[in-house]
């Protein structure tokens, strides 16, 4: 069986606009959540989000081209640029039919959709931008990345809501492992911190209305009241192991297993018993050819909603039995907020660095224990501990569940 490894990573996040800055922030428990600046929140019940800060789009895309791209695509290009440079791969020397792209987004170009709807209402719908459709459709980040690097292999976009990023990584694993591709640029991107996007999730009672940044995104805390929206992108270069060795690539870790299921229960609410999320974890462990007790760390979906955190805790207990209480289980959304379709990719990067560096990120701002969430959530401070195997979970509206297993390469 062909093995699949990570040879490059890139990120744009609320806690850093590159992987190194993000990792330093995560290790030290830095909170990237703050007051919303993307729009006037005077009439919004939600005041906080995890915004990308200090990002210069003109460093990524020519000014003339910026008006043809939504922010989620620009974030994806920035993360992809970093990942490709980090991998030191020269696509000019590769068979580009064997090099593909799988990039996800949960919502796509919502900023563009909102702006052009308002333009249509005020000026007539024949006056919307000619770039409206290609800017807003969800697959365009993948298309732009393929164009930038001249990649002619499989190019797809996974849309499974907040599980999208993890499904993208998992699908890339299978494409390479099964021999269809040798290299895949994979991950996710999101940008929907607008009054329209925030309003939609607020109407669903999904977002925290807390105004204290230290008590807003608080996964597994008894006082949690909803998630905090984030934005950005995460991109990984997945590569067949022998292919990576042949070109002398550095290797972060191996993507060893993948599981994906559906609750088939409700459009937004997860199964309270976590049974299908547990099944995704079990499938990922089996796919990796290991035992449940081999897993050292789980980067949880951990959104800070009442239903998710309780259901995911139940799922981990179902999947791991008594070993669940020996695991470290943290949610880095306590720092980044919930980056929706980008979250799984960013958390795969964080999990890869946990494996490589033997450092387990914390769940910050944890104060009030919840008996329904009684696992070791690594409260408030990172932990140095051997991590041979990590798991990263993502769960999405529609009942989508996805888990990947990452293995140390020595």
Language-model region placement:
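Glycine-/small-residue-rich "gating" segment that lines the acyl/pantetheine channel
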Residues: 122-129, 170, 174, 190-246, ...
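Acyl-CoA/ACP chain-elongation machinery
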Residues: 180-225, 258-272, 302-309, 326-376
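ACP-dependent fatty acid/polyketide chain-elongation machinery
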Residues: 1-65, 242-254, 349-364, 407-410
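Active-site-proximal alpha-helical scaffold in enzymes
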Residues: 76-89, 138-142, 146-149, 154-190, ...
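Condensing-enzyme catalytic core mediating Claisen C-C bond formation in acyl metabolism
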Residues: 3-7, 30-34, 212-288, 297
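Short, well-ordered amphipathic alpha-helical segments that serve as non-catalytic structural scaffolds
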Residues: 76-87, 141, 168, 239-240, ...
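Conserved beta-ketoacyl condensing-enzyme motif
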Residues: 6, 22, 27-160, 189-198, ...
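Phosphate/pyrophosphate-binding loops at sites that engage ATP/ADP/AMP, CoA/4′-phosphopantetheine
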Residues: 83-95, 244-249, 281-297, 319-323
């Amino acid at each position: 069986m062909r093995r699949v490894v990570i040879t490059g990573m890139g990120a744009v996040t609320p806690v850093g606009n590159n992987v190194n800055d993000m990792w330093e922030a995560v290790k030290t428990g830095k909170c990237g959540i703050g007051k919303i600046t993307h729009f006037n929140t005077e009439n919004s019940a939600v005041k906080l989000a995890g915004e990308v800060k200090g990002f210069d789009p003109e460093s990524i895309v020519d000014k003339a081209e910026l008006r043809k791209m939504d922010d989620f695509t620009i974030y994806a290009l920035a993360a992809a640029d970093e990942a490709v440079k980090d991998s030191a791969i020269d696509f000019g020397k590769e068979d580009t039919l064997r090099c593909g792209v799988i990039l996800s987004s949960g919502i796509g170009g919502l900023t563009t959709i909102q702006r052009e709807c308002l333009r249509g209402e005020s000026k007539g719908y024949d006056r919307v931008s000619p770039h409206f459709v290609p800017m807003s459709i969800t697959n365009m980040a993948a298309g732009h990345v393929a164009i930038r690097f001249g990649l002619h292999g499989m190019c797809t976009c996974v849309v499974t809501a907040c599980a999208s990023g993890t499904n993208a990584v998992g699908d890339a694993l299978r494409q390479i492992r099964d021999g269809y591709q040798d290299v895949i640029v994979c991950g996710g991107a999101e940008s929907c911190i607008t009054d329209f996007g925030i309003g939609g999730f607020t109407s669903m009672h999904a977002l925290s209305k807390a105004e204290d940044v230290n008590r807003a995104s608080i996964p597994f805390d008894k006082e949690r009241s909803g998630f905090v929206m984030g934005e950005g992108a995460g991109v990984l270069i997945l590569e067949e192991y022998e292919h990576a060795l042949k070109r002398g690539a550095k290797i972060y870790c191996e993507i060893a297993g993948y599981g994906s299921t559906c609750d088939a229960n409700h459009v937004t609410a997860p199964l309270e018993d976590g049974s299908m999320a547990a099944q995704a974890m079990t499938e990922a462990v089996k796919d990796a050819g290991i035992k449940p007790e081999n897993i050292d760390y789980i980067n949880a979906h951990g959104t800070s909603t009442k239903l998710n955190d309780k259901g995911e805790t139940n799922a981990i207990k179902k999947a791991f039995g008594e070993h669940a209480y020996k695991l470290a289980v943290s949610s880095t959304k306590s720092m980044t907020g919930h980056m929706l379709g980008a979250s799984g990719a960013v958390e795969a990067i964080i999990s890869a660095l946990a494996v490589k560096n033997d450092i387990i990120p914390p769940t910050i701002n944890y104060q009030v224990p919840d008996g329904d969430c009684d696992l070791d959530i690594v409260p408030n401070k990172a932990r140095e501990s051997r991590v041979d195997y990590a798991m990263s979970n993502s769960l999405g509206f529609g009942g989508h569940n996805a888990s990947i297993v990452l293995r140390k390469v020595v």
